[in-house]
Structure formats: structure tokens, C-alpha cells
């Protein structure tokens, strides 16, 4: 079996990161799916393909919460955290070859990092933009994206309009600003180790000091 591995939400300031692996006996199994990188697909296309992939392929996912990411980052880099999670889904699928989207400027080094977390032999093919090159990684990208979108939807029901969770999203930043204004601390779903959060907190502290004096 071969598998593809990708993640969604790596750079998000709110909510979890999702790592997904998709295993197939051969690439012919998914040749007719019309797979592409999840970012090139509409939400409805992703949902349709998600159902098809889950039905026809072996799938493994790992969901890492914001609090867990903060805890990991006290001990390792984010890239190492992703590599560990990639290894977890690879171990669950137990393929002979795993294609991974490299989370390192050096894809060969990233392959070695992932391999170091595996206890069973597996050939790791690590490349940048693997989600655009290998359909099996595109499939993993779709599973990761849809799974994360569903997790964000659950959080929005509980916490209100949080946007996509990414620092580039004005709705996400507006939510963070409003929450910190009211509670003086970041929300539980925020990655407190992110510079976005520390910068907003620093601005609020500076603003409070200025008004005091």
C-alpha cells in the first residue's frame, strides 16, 4: 500500500491542526476521482470528494488542539510537531511508501525527521507542494481540510463568529480583539504561543498603561 499525508490549519491562530493520511492499494484506485489540492476546490467539491475518499480508501486523521500545540511548542518546533503527527498517521496506515508534503525548507531533512518517529520500515517521499503533484496527497489534503472546517464550525457554534481561524482573516482578528478586550486573556481556542496573540496582548497592555498615565 502507498499513502499520502498532508495537514490543514498549521498556520491558524485559532482552533486545531488536522493531519490526514490516505492509503490506497494502487494509484489506479483514485485516478478517476478528479483530485486536486484542496485549496483549488470549492467547499462543495471538497465535501463530495471527502465522502468518496472515505468510502474507497483507508483514512487516518489526527486532530491537535490549540492547547496541545502550545504544549508541544514548549518542547519542539512546529515543523517537528507536524512531523510527529505525520508519523502517527503513517503508522496507523502501515504503507510501504508514504508521500508527504514537506514542512521544512529541506524536504530530505523532513523525510528523515518523519522516519525517525516510525518504528516500522517505510519509504518516505518528501516534497514541497506534494499535494499538487501526487493525487494520494491531494486526497489527504482534502480529508484534512474538510475535517478541520468541521472542527472550526463546531467551535463557531460555541464561541461565535471566529472566522477561518487564520491571522490573515479580519473576522478572526476582530474576534480575538473583542475577546481580549472583554476577558483580558486569549480565548481557550487560541494558540497562545503564536506571535499574533502575544502582539495583541502587548497592544492591550500598552493601551491600558497609556490610559492610566
UniProtKB/Swiss-Prot annotation:
<keyword id="KW-0479">Metal-binding</keyword>
<dbReference type="GO" id="GO:0003723">
    <property type="term" value="F:RNA binding"/>
</dbReference>
<dbReference type="Pfam" id="PF01351">
    <property type="entry name" value="RNase_HII"/>
</dbReference>
<comment type="similarity">
    <text>Belongs to the RNase HII family.</text>
</comment>
<protein>
    <recommendedName>
        <fullName>Ribonuclease HII</fullName>
        <ecNumber>3.1.26.4</ecNumber>
    </recommendedName>
</protein>
<keyword id="KW-0963">Cytoplasm</keyword>
<keyword id="KW-0378">Hydrolase</keyword>
<feature type="binding site">
    <location>
        <position position="7"/>
    </location>
    <ligand>
        <name>a divalent metal cation</name>
    </ligand>
</feature>
<keyword id="KW-0540">Nuclease</keyword>
<dbReference type="InterPro" id="IPR023160">
    <property type="entry name" value="RNase_HII_hlx-loop-hlx_cap_dom"/>
</dbReference>
<dbReference type="GO" id="GO:0032299">
    <property type="term" value="C:ribonuclease H2 complex"/>
</dbReference>
<dbReference type="InterPro" id="IPR004649">
    <property type="entry name" value="RNase_H2_suA"/>
</dbReference>
<feature type="domain" description="RNase H type-2">
    <location>
        <begin position="1"/>
        <end position="206"/>
    </location>
</feature>
<dbReference type="InterPro" id="IPR036397">
    <property type="entry name" value="RNaseH_sf"/>
</dbReference>
<feature type="binding site">
    <location>
        <position position="101"/>
    </location>
    <ligand>
        <name>a divalent metal cation</name>
    </ligand>
</feature>
<dbReference type="GO" id="GO:0006298">
    <property type="term" value="P:mismatch repair"/>
</dbReference>
<dbReference type="InterPro" id="IPR012337">
    <property type="entry name" value="RNaseH-like_sf"/>
</dbReference>
<dbReference type="GO" id="GO:0030145">
    <property type="term" value="F:manganese ion binding"/>
</dbReference>
<dbReference type="InterPro" id="IPR020787">
    <property type="entry name" value="RNase_HII_arc"/>
</dbReference>
<keyword id="KW-0255">Endonuclease</keyword>
<keyword id="KW-0464">Manganese</keyword>
<dbReference type="GO" id="GO:0004523">
    <property type="term" value="F:RNA-DNA hybrid ribonuclease activity"/>
</dbReference>
<comment type="function">
    <text>Endonuclease that specifically degrades the RNA of RNA-DNA hybrids.</text>
</comment>
<dbReference type="InterPro" id="IPR001352">
    <property type="entry name" value="RNase_HII/HIII"/>
</dbReference>
<feature type="binding site">
    <location>
        <position position="6"/>
    </location>
    <ligand>
        <name>a divalent metal cation</name>
    </ligand>
</feature>
<dbReference type="GO" id="GO:0005737">
    <property type="term" value="C:cytoplasm"/>
</dbReference>
<dbReference type="GO" id="GO:0043137">
    <property type="term" value="P:DNA replication, removal of RNA primer"/>
</dbReference>
<dbReference type="InterPro" id="IPR024567">
    <property type="entry name" value="RNase_HII/HIII_dom"/>
</dbReference>
Amino acid at each position: 500500500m502507498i499513502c499520502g499525508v498532508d495537514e490543514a490549519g498549521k498556520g491558524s491562530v485559532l482552533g486545531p491542526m488536522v493531519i490526514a493520511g490516505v492509503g490506497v492499494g494502487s494509484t489506479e484506485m483514485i485516478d478517476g476521482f478528479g483530485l486536486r489540492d484542496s485549496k483549488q476546490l470549492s467547499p462543495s467539491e471538497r465535501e463530495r470528494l471527502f465522502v468518496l475518499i472515505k468510502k474507497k480508501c483507508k483514512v487516518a486523521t489526527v486532530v491537535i488542539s490549540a492547547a496541545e500545540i502550545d504544549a508541544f511548542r514548549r518542547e519542539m518546533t512546529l515543523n517537528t510537531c507536524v512531523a510527529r503527527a505525520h508519523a502517527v498517521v503513517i503508522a496507523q496506515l502501515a504503507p510501504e511508501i508514504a508521500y508527504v508534503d514537506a514542512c521544512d525548507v529541506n524536504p530530505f531533512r523532513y523525510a528523515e525527521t518523519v522516519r525517525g518517529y516510525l518504528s516500522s520500515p517505510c519509504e518516505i517521499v518528501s516534497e514541497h507542494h506534494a499535494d499538487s503533484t501526487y493525487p494520494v496527497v491531494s486526497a489527504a489534503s482534502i480529508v484534512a481540510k474538510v475535517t478541520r472546517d468541521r472542527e472550526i464550525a463546531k467551535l463557531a457554534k460555541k464561541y461565535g463568529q471566529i472566522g477561518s481561524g487564520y491571522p490573515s482573516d479580519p473576522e478572526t482578528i476582530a474576534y480575538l480583539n473583542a475577546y481580549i478586550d472583554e476577558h483580558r486573556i486569549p480565548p481557550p481556542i487560541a494558540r497562545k504561543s503564536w506571535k499574533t496573540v502575544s502582539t495583541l496582548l502587548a497592544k492591550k497592555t500598552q493601551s491600558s498603561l497609556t490610559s492610566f498615565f
